């Protein structure tokens, strides 16, 4: 159910950059939180649609056990209603509002499509909106399924009113677990980019190192990538990056600003 672009910064040698003691890492941290929140919507909704199709009586969704389903079987549309009070999910996060999934075919099968919209949706007090697509395209030359993931008109609104705007287009490649019926033995790699805006700055991000998601972590309520790096390109030209580590199921990221690293535990 994470989701980017131009100025030749990637060749910079971080070891030679000065430490920028007055640089603010909060924008990169907010980007990590927002990207994860948008990715959660896609990944959790895909997971929930699969679980419903396989067993309409299923009731232990990642969103939380208090979710109400409104099913339009004619138009293959499912509304996951989390209510005004909200549901606390398996990850300990409270979500409110509605997630509306419009699907064609079984998700994760080549040719299937999944479109997602949100209605009065929030995550632990952060309002989230946007239009999502998560479509299974075809198997590549290695036999791995590739999926096209996009977010348009995304907004991530903090409780204090600050707004991060967001759009992205990324490719997910299903590299392990395709032959299994188990939802929690899958591995996906993702590459691509995003464009975001925060506090008047328009910036982009690109995957510097392929970002890896392992569904074994999802069973423990951890939906963050296990490894990989985003490189962020801001108007000020200062090198920024978000590093998800080397494979552990955790919520730790290292944000780099110029030549200084900041370690954060994300929500």
Segment roles from a protein language model:
Residues 1-3:
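Sec-dependent signal peptide recognition
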Residues 7-11:
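C-terminal motif of bacterial Sec signal peptides marking the signal peptidase cleavage site
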Residues 13-267:
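Low-complexity, intrinsically disordered segments exposed to solvent
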């Amino acid at each position: 159910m994470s989701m980017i672009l131009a100025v030749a910064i990637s060749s910079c040698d971080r070891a030679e950059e000065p430490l920028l003691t007055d640089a603010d890492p909060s924008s990169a941290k907010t980007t990590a939180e927002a990207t994860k929140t948008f990715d959660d919507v896609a990944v959790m909704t895909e997971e929930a649609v699969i679980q419903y199709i396989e067993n309409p009586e299923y009731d232990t969704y990642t969103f939380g056990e208090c979710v109400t389903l409104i099913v339009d079987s004619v138009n293959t549309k499912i509304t996951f209603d989390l209510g005004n009070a909200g549901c606390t999910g398996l990850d300990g996060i409270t979500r409110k509002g509605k997630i509306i999934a419009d699907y064609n075919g079984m998700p994760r099968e080549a040719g299937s499509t999944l479109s997602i919209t949100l209605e009065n949706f929030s995550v632990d007090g952060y309002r989230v909106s946007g239009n999502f697509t998560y479509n299974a395209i075809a198997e590549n030359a290695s036999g791995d399924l590739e999926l096209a993931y996009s977010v348009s008109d995304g907004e991530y609104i903090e409780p204090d009113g600050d707004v991060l705007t967001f759009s992205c287009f990324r490719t997910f490649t299903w590299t392990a677990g395709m032959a299994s019926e188990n939802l929690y033995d899958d591995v996906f790699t993702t590459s691509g980019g995003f464009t975001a805006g925060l506090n008047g700055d328009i910036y982009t991000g690109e995957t510097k190192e392929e970002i890896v998601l392992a569904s074994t972590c999802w069973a423990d309520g951890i939906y963050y990538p296990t490894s990989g790096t985003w490189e962020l390109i801001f108007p000020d030209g200062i090198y920024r990056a978000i590093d998800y580590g080397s494979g552990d199921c955790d919520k730790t990221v290292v944000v780099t600003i110029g030549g200084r690293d900041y370690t954060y535990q994300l929500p």
